[in-house]
Amino acid sequence: MVVGDISTGTDVAVVGAGPGGYVAAIRAGQLGLDVTLVEKDAYGGTCLNYGCIPSKAMITASGVAHEAGHAEEMGVYADPDVDVAEMVDWKDGVVDQLTGGVEKLCKANGVNLIEGRAEFAGSDKLRVVHGGDGQGSETIEYEHAIVSTGSRPIEVPGFDFGDDPVLDSRQALAMAELPSSMVIVGGGYIGMELSTVFAKLGVDVTVVEMLDGILPQYGDDIARPVRQRAEELGIDFHFGLAADSWTDTDDGIVVTAADEDGEETEFETEKVLVAVGRQPVTDTLNLDAVGLEPNDDGRLETDHEARTDVENVFAIGDVAPGPMLAHKASKEGEVAAEVIAGEPAALDYQAVPAAVFTDPEIGTVGLTEDDAAAQGFDPVVGTFPFNASGRALTTGHDDGFVEVVADEESGFLLGAQIVGPEASELVAELGLAIEMGATLEDVASTIHTHPTLSEATMEAAEHALGHAVHTLNR
């Protein structure tokens, strides 16, 4: 049965309930606006349901299993029995708790929740289609719209996610049974995080990367400890190869990859995970109806208020320019809601942190030394290795370092690069320092608890000033 169209009105229509959209909706509700949030899949979006949260749960669980079986140096001998199905159930429980919380918070802040796929139907209208079997549609008239439809995995020609042995990250994280072997196409952050998970769970992992190294957005000094650790876990790397096809065999599949000269290499495996990046979802929105056109990357250009070229339409998260980061999306959602409500708000990207949950972890914020020099600063750099940290040594994880970058003349902190234990947590202190306009002296003179990993940030600042105590000065 087809249900006729229903028409409703709202101050703010938010399309997509990921970490950008639901935060925007909640903030707008807090500010007294009438808000409608439309989601076609699950509240919390890719991040909470299929990406950030489930991957970190599996990273933690696989890490516990691996640590338990590899602690002989500490006098601990164990052979843990891993039930992957129970591990996945635990991961799903974490996801359910968080997504349920999002839905409750939205309702508590007066947000009207609508399930369906939204597209623009004019300069002030959205059409929402419910379900895919003629369950009807409705029209939402809005004063302002916020586009937060996120991103989806990029498919590689020849590797259709609908084919059984070919996985995207969402499918890989849902496997209740592990394959004996896996080829991972892509050595970026998704490929490296998941290669670590599966290697620690005993899967024979091969990473095929088109470029000449892993984690191409980071320098070799940051990527090197991650690659070394991955190789210790048994991960096999092949660089300069582009995967182009796969074929069935009696024992699994064969993945074929070619170098720039066309010379082919074959890899026998049971599964292949394609993790070459993500692309913004803007092609389903009927943007012509509202007068918007995505840029060459498929994103919507925005200003410092997250506003697009159309005055009453905002874009946040993966569909807006900049790195695809959940916390960036959330902040953009807050700013968009506040601007719509008439509050003074603007975006500032100088101190947006990023993290990669590999082993060891990576945490970065602000400018690198090269970035700082390119922007006209005279950068001074300080570093502190974790193998000189008492706390790092007591955890058994002492790979990596903290590096801080500052302007030599003023002393203002400009950026930080961390690779090592808990880098994702440690980088927050340095992000706050940059946001507040702190100097090297401010960081160095702040007393840090001993023994902690956070002392490394203080020591790195002291090193940049030339008076480090626990490492040699420049």
UniProtKB/Swiss-Prot annotation:
Catalytic reaction list: N(6)-[(R)-dihydrolipoyl]-L-lysyl-[protein] + NAD(+) = N(6)-[(R)-lipoyl]-L-lysyl-[protein] + NADH + H(+)
Principal cellular location given in the protein's record: cytoplasm
Cofactor dependence: FAD
Gene3D superfamilies, per database record: 3.30.390.30, FAD/NAD(P)-binding domain
GO function terms (MF aspect): dihydrolipoyl dehydrogenase (NADH) activity; flavin adenine dinucleotide binding
GO BP field: 2-oxoglutarate metabolic process; pyruvate metabolic process
Binding positions for FAD per the UniProt entry: 39-47, 56, 118, 318, 326
Binding site for NAD(+): 186-190, 209, 275-278
Domain of life: Archaea
UniProt keyword terms in alphabetical order: Cytoplasm, Disulfide bond, FAD, Flavoprotein, NAD, Oxidoreductase, Redox-active center
Pfam family, one: Pyr_redox_2
GO cellular component: cytoplasm
Enzyme class: oxidoreductase
Keyword Disulfide bond attached: yes
Cofactor-binding details, from the entry: Binds 1 FAD per subunit.
Cellular localisation: Cytoplasm
Disulfide bonds: 47-52
Catalytic center residues: 450
Its EC number(s): 1.8.1.4
The family this protein is said to belong to: Belongs to the class-I pyridine nucleotide-disulfide oxidoreductase family.
Note: The active site is a redox-active disulfide bond.
Complex formation: Homodimer.
Record-given protein name: Dihydrolipoyl dehydrogenase
Source organism (scientific name): Halobacterium salinarum (strain ATCC 700922 / JCM 11081 / NRC-1)
